[in-house]
């Protein structure tokens, strides 16, 4: 999975990304040449100063590169993040709605189908990992801050490395935010 986010270098800079479109394209090509036959590219809509035209261009450029999978996420501003503290010029709700609709239209024209809210794939290339979340397949996270779903229990491991490093062998000692799923 390669995180392009946008094909507009100005948008990338506003996001704090350290790559340009040309560098992303080079990385994508290097992945292909290394033998990766199933690539995902992440894109983001609703970015600062982004408009429908630049979003459509991003979709068309990336779809034209023919990755097997495209994740098209909408930017969500979270409290406590640098973006939340800035006054940003973001697309309004109507423009974001049009971006979402155009995502489906453009990617469908390139042979992708939508199988989740934000995910599009070529036939047979849907991400099994993503589908597992929707079908409640069990998964185990290992390491600091990792998430798991196991035996109808959802939980997160400690985020503090010093405490996690003192693990005593009892899994319960490092699990937090436990939630039992009943439906």
Could you say what each language-model-derived stretch is?
Residues 1-183:
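C-terminal scaffold of the Radical SAM
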């Amino acid at each position: 999975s390669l995180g392009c986010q946008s094909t507009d270098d100005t948008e990338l800079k506003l996001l704090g990304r350290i790559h340009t479109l040309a560098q992303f394209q080079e990385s994508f090509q290097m992945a292909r040449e290394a033998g990766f036959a199933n690539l995902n590219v992440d894109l983001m809509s609703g970015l600062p100063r982004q408009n429908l035209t630049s979003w459509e261009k991003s979709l068309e450029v990336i779809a034209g590169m023919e990755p097997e999978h495209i994740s098209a996420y909408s930017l969500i501003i979270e409290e406590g993040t640098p973006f939340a503290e800035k006054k940003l010029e973001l697309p309004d709700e109507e423009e974001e709605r049009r971006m979402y609709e155009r995502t489906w239209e453009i990617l469908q024209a390139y042979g992708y189908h939508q199988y989740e809210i934000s995910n599009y794939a070529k036939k047979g290339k849907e991400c099994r990992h993503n589908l597992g979340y929707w079908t409640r397949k069990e998964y185990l996270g290992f390491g600091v801050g990792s998430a798991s779903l196991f035996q109808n229990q959802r939980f997160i491991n400690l985020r503090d490395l010093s405490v996690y490093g003192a693990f005593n062998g009892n899994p319960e000692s490092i699990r937090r935010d436990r939630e039992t799923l009943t439906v």
